[in-house]
From Swiss-Prot:
Keywords: Cell inner membrane, Cell membrane, Electron transport, Membrane, Translocase, Transmembrane, Transmembrane helix, Transport. It is found in: Cell inner membrane. HAMAP family: RsxE_RnfE. One of its GO terms (cellular component) is plasma membrane. The chain crosses the membrane at residues 18-38, 39-59, 63-83, 86-106, 125-145, 182-202. Its EC number is 7.-.-.-. This is Ion-translocating oxidoreductase complex subunit E. It comes from Escherichia coli O7:K1 (strain IAI39 / ExPEC). It is a multi-pass membrane protein. One of its GO terms (biological process) is electron transport chain.
């Protein structure tokens, strides 16, 4: 259980691919103009990560070390092609919106990196969990950034959700505030850099505060009974 918990925590927070490793920044910065686009690409990447980790881990004993990278890329490309066709068939609006960034998942350093660093060394179940955790960590970062940019830029949240979830999802659209002229800077790439920088700073502050609390708790436990540590 401790290993499973560690894989989940590493993927979602401690080793977050977007906020710690800073991998996959091209789609992270380009697609997060709305929450729907961010969520769509994040879920697609999560599905690819999970399936490729599972497949590569299952075949790891039969994969020659000398040609493992080309084999990994072929597996990743096959899974991405299948996911691309699924999105094209069932979420065509999202497919048009994401465009080239769906097939570019093949070259995403996150996918190849987890295949080499984790799936090639661990069992299928744990590798699939690692892929899912890493993917969800990236999805959460993309969703937060996309939501902030959409709210600041358009005053809405989940605008165009029907492109991802179907016509019923139109009810998910929220108008946070009304604006006649959208704040274009929030929808352009510079705001993605600014937003990502603020998220990195926020994670750093949270980590430092948690580290300080753990140190204080450890110091209190180390004191003899009856002492408070106050002079």
């Amino acid at each position: 259980m401790s290993e499973i918990k560690d894989v989940i925590v590493q993927g979602l927070w401690k080793n977050n691919s977007a906020l710690v490793q800073l991998l996959g920044l091209c789609p992270l910065l380009a697609v997060t103009s709305t929450a729907t686009n961010a969520l769509g690409l994040g879920l697609a990447t999560t599905l690819v990560l999970t399936l490729t980790n599972l497949t590569i881990s299952t075949l790891r004993h039969w994969t020659p070390a000398e040609i493992r990278i080309p084999i990994y890329v072929m597996i990743i490309a096959s899974v991405v092609s299948a996911v691309q066709m699924l999105i094209n068939a069932y979420a065509f609006g999202l497919y048009q919106s994401l465009g080239i960034f769906i097939p570019l998942i093949v070259t995403n350093c996150i996918v190849v990196g987890r295949a080499e660093a984790f799936a090639a060394k661990k069992g299928p179940a744990l590798s699939a969990l690692d892929g899912f955790s890493i993917g969800m960590g990236a999805t959460c970062a993309m969703f937060v950034l996309g939501s902030l940019r959409e709210i600041i830029g358009n005053g809405t949240l989940f605008d165009g959700a029907d492109a991802l979830l179907g016509s019923w999802a139109k009810v998910l659209r929220l108008e946070i505030f009304h604006t006649d002229s959208p704040f274009l800077l929030a929808m352009l790439p510079p705001s993605a850099f600014i937003g990502l920088g603020l998220m990195l700073a926020g994670k750093y502050l949270i980590d430092e505060r948690m580290k300080k609390r753990r140190a204080e708790a450890a110091a209190e436990r180390a004191l003899p009974n009856g002492e408070t540590g106050n002079v």
